[in-house]
């Protein structure tokens, strides 16, 4: 089920942080009501490992969201994970 919803007012995009398995987290990004990204695992990390905290999933989800809104390439790198202190 959905754990938290972060709505960006005056914007057509929204981020949802979701529970993955028993103890992990992922995120979904919607454009209005259309689901455009489902990310149940930490990107660019080998193996299918979910984020360890709501904060990590929210942080990376927000970075992707900001890049999408800016019209930029939104792929995540290991440097992004390191810069934001995401545990992987």
Language model features: what each stretch is:
Residues 1-30:
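Short N-terminal "domain-start" leader segments
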Residues 2-3, 37-38, 57:
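Short amphipathic alpha-helical segments, especially helix-boundary/capping motifs
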Residues 20, 45, 67-69:
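Compositionally biased, low-complexity repeat tracts
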Residues 24-42:
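A short, structured beta-strand/loop element
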Residues 38-54:
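A short, exposed loop/beta-hairpin motif centered on an aromatic-Gly-Thr core
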Residues 51-69:
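A short, charged, amphipathic alpha-helix used as a generic interaction element across diverse proteins
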Residues 72:
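A short, polar/charged loop-to-alpha-helix boundary motif
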Residues 76-88:
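Intrinsically disordered, low-complexity charged/polar segments
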């Amino acid at each position: 089920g959905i754990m938290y919803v972060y709505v960006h007012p005056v914007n057509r995009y929204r981020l949802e942080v979701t529970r993955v398995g028993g103890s992990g987290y992922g995120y979904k990004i919607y454009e209005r009501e259309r689901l455009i990204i489902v990310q149940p695992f930490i990107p660019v990390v080998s193996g299918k490992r979910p984020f360890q905290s709501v904060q990590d999933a929210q942080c990376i989800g927000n970075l992707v969201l900001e890049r999408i809104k800016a019209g930029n390439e939104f792929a995540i790198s290991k440097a992004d994970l390191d810069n934001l202190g995401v545990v992987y």
